[in-house]
Amino acid sequence: MGVQAKEQLWGGETTKAVDNFPVSGERIPVPLIHWLGRIKGAAARVNAELGLLDEDKANRIAAAADRVAEGEFDDQFPIDVFQTGSGTSSNMNANEVIATLAGDDVHRNDDVNMGQSSNDVFPSAVHLAALDTATNQLLPVLERLEASLQAKADQFKDLVKSGRTHLMDAVPVTLGQEFSGYAAQVRLGARRIQNALPQVAQIPLGGTATGTGLNTHRDFAPKVRALLTEATGLEIRPPEDPFEAQGNRDALVELSGALKVLAVSLTKIANDLAWMGSGPRTAIGEILLPELQKGSSIMPGKVNPVIPEVVLQISAQVIGNDTAITVAGTQGNFELNVRVPLIARNLLDQIRLLTSGCRIFAEKCIDGIEANQEGLNRSAEMTLSAATALNPYIGYDKGAEIVKQAAESGRPLRDVALELGVDEETYDKAMDLRTMAQGNL
């Protein structure tokens, strides 16, 4: 092996890119670096198998690329993520680092980049980094979050409370029904992500510069895909059309959209939980959120819904990232999209944020939620909308009059209803809150 020590391994093209793009101080995402290494290693092995690359060179290139893939040289990728839109600078960075590690007789372009172009390698690495992290990191965490929410749905299935629409009192529901809805949102969100991944798994590798495959062996791409699939367990696929795969990043835009929908769902869930846990004395107070830390530097005893607030901020960032990805996705002019580093940065950031956010949401919030029976009873008994259950017996207009008088006088619905002629047996039959919450279920 050529170089062992942690010295500067990149060459002149990387240095030029560092000088040209002093933009954000943010480097390309680490999973992308690792997938560049995996692709380069598989490419070297396949080129040797095809008789195109000296076997000894190929072995050294593959060994060096494997070390990049394992994260040993993350610090050797210094180029800003805001760089040339094809990712050429980072592809050259990978070629230079691997060539230096592999030995002086290894050429960064002729050997390490054999059969490849930045235009097919870099987006392929982005696709596979997204496929890998979504499959192996995000989806298992979503399964965990769904299970946590469903466990609470089962725990709270008999606890009746006031429903709310337009932030106003509505007919009763159970707390378990609300959590069942939250679990379904997460489950459906995971399904949307899963449905987007087969398209992400279609990579443009083998198209080289414009999708034609110029300067690459016709068996190169299938064999590289097979090696990567065998090594990772991911089902990596050929594109339906090489020019579609080369000229746009629609599959990544689609995945981002699914991630955005999940963020929208998490926003609803986190907001609901923060509202239901509000108080403890002057607001809704139907649930008790875990007390994790002091909520104020001036108000003693104050506790805030810190985990829902984190989830809300993560969701806002994910939605913002999706907007940037959507705009970047429109820049697939002719044979190449030239906003790929931006897409990579924002998409992998979405996956990372949602993975960590959903994990702490389950572990530090959902698992520890308890029902506040006093608050639930208060909301269930005080909602005037429960009078809706009287409609089949007395009609809408008379029910509306009962609600109006109860609201104006502050008297219980029962007292007003009996006073206006509803017999006691009818009232008690219609106004059983638990039966009411079941609706026609």
Segment roles from a protein language model:
Residues M1-L441:
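Conserved, well-structured ligand/cofactor-binding cores
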